[in-house]
Curated annotation (Swiss-Prot):
HAMAP family referenced in this protein's UniProt entry, alphabetically: Ribosomal_bS20
Protein name: Small ribosomal subunit protein bS20
RNA-binding among keywords: yes
Keyword RNA-binding: yes
Entry GO MF terms: small ribosomal subunit rRNA binding; structural constituent of ribosome
Organism domain of life: Bacteria
PANTHER family for the chain: 30S RIBOSOMAL PROTEIN S20, SMALL RIBOSOMAL SUBUNIT PROTEIN BS20C
Family the entry assigns: Belongs to the bacterial ribosomal protein bS20 family.
């Protein structure tokens, strides 16, 4: 256990940020899974709207520093390729 006041504060701040990051990552994974299910069902209209949501979630998580921007770009590219392959 930390004895120094600033170390105690850092523990609290880290716990808050960890919780926030978990929430954002969970929402991101859910959005991607919903898109994947729509692609598997071969539902192009639903997949297109879910792609927009997944891309938005990826951009938001990258801008907040939860995931790396290159990882977000790579995932968006792969999701777009899956969407375009449905045509």
């Amino acid at each position: 256990m930390a004895n120094i006041k600033s170390a105690k504060k850092r523990i609290k701040v880290t716990e808050k940020k960890t919780l926030r990051n978990k929430m954002i990552k969970s929402a991101l994974k859910t959005a991607i899974k919903k898109f994947e299910v729509a692609v598997q069902a071969n539902n192009k209209a639903e997949a297109a709207t879910l792609y927009v949501e997944a891309a938005r979630a990826l951009d938001m998580s990258a801008s907040k520093g939860v995931v790396h921007k290159n990882m977000a770009a790579r995932k968006k590219s792969r999701l777009a390729a899956k969407l375009n392959a449905m045509a």
